[in-house]
């Protein structure tokens, strides 16, 4: 029973993980972009051959917010907290929430093409992009594949490669597809399922499981990343601590002392929240302040 409950939790969490292959006057003038009119909530954009649902919250410099797998409301109240200082554009990825599925497989790479197309559709120029878990993988791929569309990047509990996760997490990834019907039925009857009754939950778990079974390794791509980046992890995350350090070093951190004046510190930043896990990080009330401070730095 304990193993069954662990695997249920872990496989649902696996769905949250990135897997694949293949102007506000408080902001610096150089980072201004065109803004969406306030109040344009609950809109569907026809982009990249898909109907992408997004909602707009707050005003200021746009921040594209990308949820974790399965749950389009992964950030909870943090979405609205972030919107107090900027314009948050919360996107529902393919097959999630109010964005319908298509015959296309789920992959962070192709999901990132949707995000970049949405940024272009909204005529934002460059936007800050923040993602959690699956959304972190999509955000990272957006910055890799569409560097012209991304200003700053916030990656919350994302991995460079599948081998960055603990072995039990990898095992959960590999079993998710085979349990799709079981988990789909469970979610359909949950508050999440009731909030989004049009989602085919079994299909979503099946396609997510097919994605999470695939190996991926983005190490070679990350070293060429141009977007200024904030990594956020929990002290008890789903990723091995060695992998977190590896990710940080790939972004230029952890190579030398910053010096008394901080002049040798990297442009990118790392935050590790204590008393947190992969499962609590997106809704952690400490997260918005960390993100806002990073986005506001010159």
Protein language model regions, located:
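Flexible "cap/lid" loop of the alpha/beta hydrolase fold
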Residues: 140-145, 153-187
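Active-site loop/oxyanion-hole signature of alpha/beta-hydrolase fold enzymes
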Residues: 90-130
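Conserved HGGG/HGGXW glycine-rich cap/lid loop of the alpha/beta-hydrolase fold
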Residues: 50-98
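Short beta-strand/loop motif that positions the catalytic acidic residue
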Residues: 225, 231-233
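Conserved loop-alpha-helix segment in the C-terminal half of the alpha/beta-hydrolase fold
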Residues: 238-269, 273-274
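Active-site nucleophile elbow and catalytic-triad environment of alpha/beta-hydrolase enzymes
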Residues: 206-221
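N-terminal export signals
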Residues: 5-23
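Catalytic active-site module of serine/aspartate enzymes centered on a nucleophile-bearing elbow/loop
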Residues: 266-298
